[in-house]
A protein has these predicted regions:
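Glycosyltransferase catalytic domains, chiefly GT-A lineage
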Residues: 1-170
Length: 170
């Protein structure tokens, strides 16, 4: 793993601080972060080295995503799963930004806590985290998918653009 990346904003800054602390306990690789200006201030005060902070997330940025790309397209996703489409696209853009700087990266959602060294010998250029469904709702995998993007290992520079294209056009 050459780098890590994640997105955060004021509503997830507590999670982001825990993610950063747990990452730095086990890893020294650069961390590419898309965030809002407030999160940038908080993160910079933590004093961690090798952070690449890109404060692009703001109301105008998010509103632009909705108006130009996702308006009404993902209403059901947002209502049922409380998963904002504007943040999903921001996450994909973060992955793309990290891949423009590094040969590979591991994207992590801010609710991930790193408990050990994550260095793995990935056998594919893209690795998605599996979604977990208890036996009683295992069939949900067919409806919602068997993978989520809580973590994404990427070593293919074209993949983020492909994923963004699929997200916007499918």
């Amino acid at each position: 793993i050459q780098s890590f990346c994640f997105t955060t904003s004021i509503n997830r800054i507590s999670e982001a601080k825990i993610l950063l602390k747990s990452l730095r306990e086990h890893h020294s690789q650069p961390i590419f972060i898309h965030c809002d200006w407030f999160s940038q201030l908080v993160i910079e005060r933590l004093g961690y080295k090798d952070l690449i902070i890109n404060p692009v997330i703001n109301e105008k940025y998010l509103k632009n995503i909705v108006e130009k790309h996702t308006k009404n397209k993902y209403d059901i996703l947002e209502q049922i799963h409380h998963c904002r489409s504007d943040y999903i696209l921001a996450k994909l853009r973060c992955l793309k930004g990290a891949m423009m700087m590094f040969e590979n990266t591991l994207f992590l959602d801010t609710d991930v806590i790193v408990l050990d060294d994550l260095q793995e010998n990935f056998t594919t250029k893209v690795c998605l985290s599996p979604a977990h469904f208890p036996n009683s709702i295992r069939h949900f995998g067919f409806e919602y998918g068997f993978y989520n993007a809580g973590y994404v290992f990427c070593a293919n520079r074209g993949f983020p653009s492909f994923w963004i294209d699929r997200f916007l056009k499918d």
